Amino acid sequence: INWLKLGKAIIDAL
């Protein structure tokens, strides 16, 4: 799992 990509996706969803 790519945590940086996941984190970016979560931030973008906020």
UniProtKB/Swiss-Prot annotation:
InterPro entries: Mastoparan_peptide. Keywords: Amidation, Antibiotic, Antimicrobial, Fungicide, G-protein coupled receptor impairing toxin, Immunity, Innate immunity, Mast cell degranulation, Secreted, Toxin. Could be used to treat biofilm-resistant agents such as A.baumannii and Staphylococcus spp. coated on the surfaces of implanted medical devices, such as vascular stents. The modification Leucine amide is found at residue 14. Expressed by the venom gland. Its main location: secreted. Changing residue 2 to F: In NeuroVAL; important decrease in hemolytic activity, important decrease in antimicrobial activity, no loss of antinociceptive activity, and acts as a non-toxic cell-penetrating peptide towards cancer and non-cancer cells. Pfam families: Mastoparan_2 (PF08251). GO terms for molecular function: toxin activity. GO terms for biological process: defense response to bacterium; defense response to fungus; innate immune response; killing of cells of another organism. It comes from the Eukaryota. One of its GO terms (cellular component) is extracellular region. It is found in: Secreted. Antimicrobial peptide with potent activity towards many Gram-positive, and Gram-negative bacteria, as well as potent activity towards yeasts (C.albicans, C.tropicalis, and C.neoformans). Inhibits biofilm formation of A.baumannii and Staphylococcus spp. bacteria. Also shows potent mast cell degranulation activity and potent hemolytic activity of rat erythrocytes. Its mast cell degranulation activity may be related to the activation of G-protein coupled receptors in mast cells as well as interaction with other proteins located in cell endosomal membranes in the mast cells. Belongs to the MCD family. Mastoparan subfamily. The primary structure of this mature peptide is identical to that of Agelaia-MPI from Agelaia p. pallipes (AC P04205). This is Agelaia-MPI.
